[in-house]
Amino acid sequence: MTLSPEDIKIIEKYALQNAVKYGKAPQPKAVMGKVMGECPQLRADPSGVSAALENIVSEIAKGNPEAWEARLSEIAPELIEALSVKKEPDKGLKPLEGAETGKVVMRFAPNPNGPATLGSSRGMVVNSEYVKVYKGKFILRFDDTDPDIKRPMLEAYDWYMDDFKWLGVVPDQVVRASDRFPIYYDYARKLIEMGKAYVCFCKGEDFKRLKDSKKACPHRDTDPEENLMHWEKMLAGEYEDQQAVLRIKTDIEHKDPALRDWGAFRIRKMSHPRPEIGNKYIVWPLLDFAGAIEDHELGMTHIIRGKDLIDSEKRQTYIYKYFGWTYPKTTHWGRVKIHEFGKFSTSTLRKAIESGEYSGWDDPRLPTIRAIRRRGIRAEALKKFMIEMGVGMTDVSISMESLYAENRKIVDPVANRYFFVWNPVELEIEGMKPVVAKVPRHPTDHARGMREISIENKVLVCAEDIEKLNVGSVLRLKDLCNVEITSLSPLRVKRSETSLEDLKKAKGKIIHWVPVDGIPVKVCGPEGDIEGTGERGIETELDNIVQFERFGFCRIDAVDGENVVAYFAHK
């Protein structure tokens, strides 16, 4: 065969791609493999391709990387884009397959049976960020059609909205599945009429036995008219709880039992917590059915979901096939394990809160967004933390320290510094006259000025700072003076003439302190509460992030007269 000009251009573009990728003249063997793999029509003339490739490589070798990239951009710009994708790090957001700017529609679909957790925040952040990148539409859909096992919490709807606001995200549309039962019922009727769904009266264990044996239940071949009659009776309340189930007809001999005639609707004579719904319905759609319908109705183009939901996609595909719909492009990601929290679920956390083990959903020991917000974690830190995980099938095991590191970059430049002494002991400075210590509000931002701390001859210090010292030990009271211990009981010191430089050379301790008339401070954190005394001025920082020197960053949560409550963020 004779190679056409188009064939020559194909060889040239792959040779150029190889050159641009590696920054040197292309490797003929690698290019040959690429050409033959991508262009089966050229396999009939390997010698002709090889000869053409030799000439092309020879010409390319005369150029430079800039010229190679310019030529590749001219004849095959898509290969430049492909190289850009491959050069991206494994972390971060990769381009969405088939995504078009302005046409991407994505959703985050939580069950509002509790507030957003760190685990669910991944979906909140990544989906909304993708929509932002592609200038698309972002939908918050509450999958709230389980009145029993994962019963919705009324407060959780607003909590999710509030958390999205905190993240700087305003959903383009908010949907509550519990408002859309008529839509689900309409599609159920259509499937029954098509002979693709049937009402099953088997007991759960009986159906499972038949399903596991790849045998149809006695109701599978009931004609559509009779199934419609049973369906209407289900809706009318003529059957009892779990007496009848509407099933989607799939392949009863499918190799995966989870895909065999799965349940789409069940009867549960329970009220919904939303007063607008209440006792309005007794036939409840299961998540796979409602989700399938919603993703079509709302025009979803892309879905990102956990790899544990791969079977959900396979089940839903039957509905899409029956109606002739195109399933959204779907990406699955692995589980996230956060070292400090291990395995947790919203239902177990809820029970622990109800039992009094935790003070509420914003208890600093919990892995909820409400809790980390209260502790002073910033939205931008969480967003970067989640985006850096990337989107892949591999399970992610990560420490909160990574989140803290991102947050530290944000709060360190803005947090005023204060002294806070925990487990305080009184220290007397012999011969000290009343003095006003001037201490920087921030170590590098000098424009903020100084904080003035008035003391007489006594201060409070942390007991642990004194524990291993002896009479004669020299240390420095930070931003005040160098002292030498003269007595351990009672604790007394005298001014020392030792210079700061000599103290540092001798590796003497530099400790913080507060006046004896400081204010009571309680710090609530993941490891429990710590009480102590803080310097005055902390009470003016309500809702701000501050740094308690030598302790950590904290958010001032409450000020009640002379008492301050702070929430620990991190070191």
UniProtKB/Swiss-Prot annotation:
E.C. number(s) listed in UniProt: 6.1.1.17
Compartment list: Cytoplasm
Keyword match Aminoacyl-tRNA synthetase: yes
Keyword Endoplasmic reticulum recorded: no
Superkingdom of this protein's organism: Archaea
GO cellular component, one term: cytosol
Biological processes, Gene Ontology terms: amide biosynthetic process; glutamyl-tRNA aminoacylation
Catalytically driven reaction(s): tRNA(Glu) + L-glutamate + ATP = L-glutamyl-tRNA(Glu) + AMP + diphosphate
UniProt xrefs under InterPro entries: Gln/Glu-tRNA_Ligase, Glu-tRNA-synth_arc/euk, Glu/Gln-tRNA-synth, Glu/Gln-tRNA-synth_Ib_cat-dom, Glu/Gln-tRNA-synth_Ib_codon-bd, Rbsml_bL25/Gln-tRNA_synth_N, Ribosomal_bL25/Gln-tRNA_synth, Rossmann-like_a/b/a_fold
Family assignment from sequence similarity: Belongs to the class-I aminoacyl-tRNA synthetase family. Glutamate--tRNA ligase type 2 subfamily.
PANTHER family xref list: GLUTAMATE--TRNA LIGASE (PTHR43097:SF5), GLUTAMINE-TRNA LIGASE (PTHR43097)
Function: Catalyzes the attachment of glutamate to tRNA(Glu) in a two-step reaction: glutamate is first activated by ATP to form Glu-AMP and then transferred to the acceptor end of tRNA(Glu).
Protein name: Glutamate--tRNA ligase
Organism: Methanosarcina mazei (strain ATCC BAA-159 / DSM 3647 / Goe1 / Go1 / JCM 11833 / OCM 88)
Gene: gltX
